[in-house]
């Protein structure tokens, strides 16, 4: 399954473009722009599993840095600052990674 099976390709393109500048990433705005906020809980979980590149059941910090590439292969990597900010917002239990429920909460709070 690809991201465009779940989200509109044009919405993804616009959202990735909106955050092309380093240190401009805002996960709340991004999730709204790609249409993730409006998706069902099941679809949000499917997006999580696409972003979980190593299929560990978690999005670890190294995967988080490439989150935009999970939506669009030609997107930029997040800066270290952006990655840490996103991890802090999503990692509710402090284990250094984001699980599917934490990701769902992160999207819902957007």
Swiss-Prot record:
Amino acids binding Ca(2+) 1: 52, 54, 56, 58, 60, 63
Annotated residues for binding of Ca(2+) 2: 91, 93, 95, 97, 102
Keyword presence, Repeat: yes
Matches recorded under Gene3D superfamilies: EF-hand (1.10.238.10)
Keyword tags: Acetylation, Calcium, Metal-binding, Muscle protein, Phosphoprotein, Repeat
Keyword Repeat listed: yes
Span of domain EF-hand: 39-74, 78-110
InterPro entries cross-referenced by the UniProt entry: EF-hand-dom_pair, EF_Hand_1_Ca_BS, EF_hand_dom, Parvalbumin
Any one Gene Ontology molecular-function term assigned to this protein's record: calcium ion binding
Domain notes: AB domain, comprising of helices A and B, is involved in structural stabilization, protecting the hydrophobic core of the protein. It is required for high-affinity binding of Ca(2+) and for Mg(2+)-binding.
Function: In muscle, parvalbumin is thought to be involved in relaxation after contraction. It binds two calcium ions.
Name of the protein described by the UniProt record: Parvalbumin alpha
Organism name: Macaca fuscata fuscata
Lineage: Eukaryota, Metazoa, Chordata, Craniata, Vertebrata
């Amino acid at each position: 399954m690809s991201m465009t099976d779940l989200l509109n390709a044009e919405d993804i393109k616009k959202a990735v473009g909106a955050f092309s500048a380093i240190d401009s990433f805002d996960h709340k705005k991004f999730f709204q722009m790609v249409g993730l906020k409006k998706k069902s809980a099941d679809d949000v979980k499917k997006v999580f599993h696409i972003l979980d590149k190593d299929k560990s059941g978690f999005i670890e910090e190294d995967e988080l840095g490439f989150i935009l590439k999970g939506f669009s292969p030609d997107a930029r990597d997040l800066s270290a600052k952006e990655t840490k900010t996103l991890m802090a917002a999503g990692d509710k239990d402090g284990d250094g990674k984001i699980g599917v429920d934490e990701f769902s909460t992160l999207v819902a709070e957007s």
